[in-house]
């Protein structure tokens, strides 16, 4: 029971962390472009 709960939490967190990393990288990229101009 606990294992399924943990696996569900992990499977739910992985996409959220990936999206978060992608968004932060994209924002830093946009910020760098604005500074270069």
Swiss-Prot record:
Compartment(s) where it occurs, according to its Swiss-Prot or TrEMBL record: Plastid, Chloroplast thylakoid membrane
Name of one Pfam family that matches: PetG
Lipid metabolism recorded as keyword: no
Chief localisation class: plastid
Entry superkingdom: Eukaryota
Gene Ontology cellular-component annotations: chloroplast thylakoid membrane; cytochrome b6f complex
Signal peptide coordinates: none
One MF term in the entry's GO annotations: electron transporter, transferring electrons within cytochrome b6/f complex of photosystem II activity
A single GO BP: cytochrome complex assembly
Membrane topology, from the record: Single-pass membrane protein
Keywords: Chloroplast, Electron transport, Membrane, Photosynthesis, Plastid, Thylakoid, Transmembrane, Transmembrane helix, Transport
Transmembrane segments: 5-25
Annotated family: Belongs to the PetG family.
NCBIfam families in UniProt: PRK00665.1 (NF001907)
UniProt function note: Component of the cytochrome b6-f complex, which mediates electron transfer between photosystem II (PSII) and photosystem I (PSI), cyclic electron flow around PSI, and state transitions. PetG is required for either the stability or assembly of the cytochrome b6-f complex.
Self-association and partners: The 4 large subunits of the cytochrome b6-f complex are cytochrome b6, subunit IV (17 kDa polypeptide, PetD), cytochrome f and the Rieske protein, while the 4 small subunits are PetG, PetL, PetM and PetN. The complex functions as a dimer.
Descriptive protein name: Cytochrome b6-f complex subunit 5
């Amino acid at each position: 029971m606990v294992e399924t709960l943990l696996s569900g939490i992990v499977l739910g967190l992985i996409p959220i962390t990936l999206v978060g990393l992608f968004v932060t990288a994209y924002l830093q990229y946009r910020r760098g472009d604005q500074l270069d101009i």
